[in-house]
Amino acid sequence: MVFPEHMEFRYYVTSERKEHFALYDRTLGSRMTYLELTQDLGQCLIDLYDTDFYDAYCVLSEINKLVQTEKNEAAWRKLLELSMPLCKVHPFFGPLVKELSKLESAYAHDQDADAAIVLSFANDFEDIVRDAKALIERCLDDRYQPDYSTAERYREAHYDALLRFDDMRYGELATEEVMLDGPAYDSAYHYSVELLRERGIRTALREVLYPNTVRDLYNYLKAYCLRLPLPIHKCKNCGRYFVVTGNITQDYCTRLMEGSEKTCRQMGAVVQYQSRQMKNPATREFTRSYKAHNARVRYGTMTKAEFTAWSKTAREKRDACVAGKLSLEDFVAWLDSDKQR
């Protein structure tokens, strides 16, 4: 076989609200992990919302054509080359690789081969992307209809026909002892407690999903996030959605601003501070006069040294005005005392 023969895909959520994806081969003697990703719970929903999947859809179209043609080693190698890189685009492509492996195995052993799941993957994935966008905008964003509960927002989204799926059913669930510091294909049941401790390998009981289809994977994640509920906000700086991991009132994400080493959250704090300051009339008057005096330097009617000295005194008087030690009228009069006619 070209594909690993005994592939498995699993998903679980940790106690720290991290989502874990793994695609691995269970074949004895050649066990390998092909995808292992741990990230903040709900990040894959954000990625469904933000990512341009045009190139991926083109690859899926090519995969469908190959699956419907005569199967030979060259075709399976091409399918492997096309499908495996998709896992780096989004972890939801992992179940597709697993299904292609299962399909090749059926052909190799002259078993009934049903390509329906593979052939429907592109349409299912496209529906998932659309559903995820409505889920984020209308259900998980708690600032949309804030007087509604998550369940009520979900019901309204259904009534408005924005969600693509009528239910949240999913595949096989199992509670397992997961090795937190070992490869995905390995199992704690192969080792004694003493040996695991000696090797420094931690384990934990987790509810693990083994999806039969990508719909199973999405439905489980969707249901999990709705039950919590998982809050998602739109960043007030870049306008993109992000998962709220701390303070529920967060307004800014942690993405780097374009062309900057600062994040939206770091810059957002500055913007908030400036906004609060500008609400004070003394600060507004200082800013107005500061700009006017700075313009004089550019026009050559004031030296830099004079501007620096003026700025130092102006800041001191502004602070005194804000503290109530100087009246606003006296402060404005001082600012305008050297006004040029």
Predicted regions and their residues:
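Cysteine-rich micro-motifs
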Residues: N247-M267
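Extracellular/mature segments of secreted proteins
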Residues: E261-K262, Q272-Q274
